[in-house]
Amino acid sequence: MTTASCIFPSQATQQDNIYGLSQITASLFISNSAVANDKLTLSNNHITTIINVSAEVVNTFFEDIQYVQVPVSDAPNSYLYDFFDPIADHIHGVEMRNGRTLLHCAAGVSRSATLCLAYLMKYHNMTLLDAHTWTKTCRPIIRPNNGFWEQLIHYEFKLFSRNTVRMIYSPIGLIPNIYEKEAYLMELM
């Protein structure tokens, strides 16, 4: 499935939302830790499940919200792969019960984005490239670390027996090929 733009364009254009809450699908949101602990924002967006993808962020437990903890650090050697299927299944289950899920880490940039991409590949039949393009349109600040990219590339191959993103060598080190132009421009500076 290729999608030209986010179905929630206001999320991508409102400056105050770039770092806060971003809606990815009708039932899935990504945010930083501050939003995940903001009862009014959670209530206004009808969040029923919060998935905390961090080892360092403490949950504020609100009534009527289910909490799931994925205690992983944002480091290239951290292992998220074993969480891809169970978390994607959980997000899908919440959606099937007409609930809404908030995925968050500390900044809403790497860990939560990684699990979002895995979910979109599994349940929206998106390639990794399409899932990244879609999510980045909805939340421009996403940038999974290189270790998570390698795990996502492996997961895409497991799901589809092909890859749309690959790791390449650049002047700044090993990067996903979708960042090749950006790395080249950085080198020119």
Swiss-Prot record:
Question: Where is the catalytic site?
Answer: C105 (phosphocysteine intermediate)
The protein's annotated catalytic reaction(s) are: O-phospho-L-tyrosyl-[protein] + H2O = L-tyrosyl-[protein] + phosphate; O-phospho-L-seryl-[protein] + H2O = L-seryl-[protein] + phosphate; O-phospho-L-threonyl-[protein] + H2O = L-threonyl-[protein] + phosphate
Query: Which regions span the lipid bilayer?
Result: none
Compartments annotated for it: namely: Cytoplasm; Nucleus; Mitochondrion inner membrane; Cytoplasm, Cytoskeleton, Flagellum axoneme
Per the record, what is the consequence of mutating C105A?
Abolished protein phosphatase activity
> By its UniProt entry, which Gene3D superfamilies does this protein fall under?
Protein tyrosine phosphatase superfamily (3.90.190.10)
Q: What is its main location?
A: cytoplasm
The domain of life is Eukaryota
Any one of the GO BP annotations? protein targeting to membrane
> Which SMART domains does this UniProt record tie to the protein?
DSPc
How does this protein lie in the membrane? Peripheral membrane protein
Positions of region (Sufficient for mitochondrial localization): 43-128
Q: Which UniProt keywords apply?
A: Cell projection, Cilium, Cytoplasm, Cytoskeleton, Flagellum, Hydrolase, Membrane, Mitochondrion, Mitochondrion inner membrane, Nucleus, Protein phosphatase
**Which GO molecular function annotations are given, in alphabetical order?**
MAP kinase tyrosine/serine/threonine phosphatase activity; phosphatase activity; phosphoprotein phosphatase activity; protein serine/threonine phosphatase activity; protein tyrosine phosphatase activity
- What is the main EC category here? hydrolase
* Cellular component annotations (GO), alphabetically ordered: axonemal A tubule inner sheath; extrinsic component of membrane; mitochondrial inner membrane; mitochondrial intermembrane space; mitochondrial matrix; mitochondrion; nucleus; sperm flagellum
Q: Where is the Tyrosine-protein phosphatase domain?
A: 20-161
How this chain assembles, per its entry, is: Microtubule inner protein component of sperm flagellar doublet microtubules.
Give the family this protein belongs to, as stated in its UniProt record: Belongs to the protein-tyrosine phosphatase family. Non-receptor class dual specificity subfamily.
User: What's the stated role of this polypeptide?
Assistant: Protein phosphatase component of the sperm flagellar doublet microtubules. May act as a regulator of sperm motility by mediating dephosphorylation of sperm doublet microtubule proteins. Can dephosphorylate single and diphosphorylated synthetic MAPK peptides, with preference for the phosphotyrosine and diphosphorylated forms over phosphothreonine.
Q: What is this protein called?
A: Dual specificity phosphatase 21
Could you tell me which species this protein originates from?
Mus musculus (Mouse)
Gene field:
Dusp21
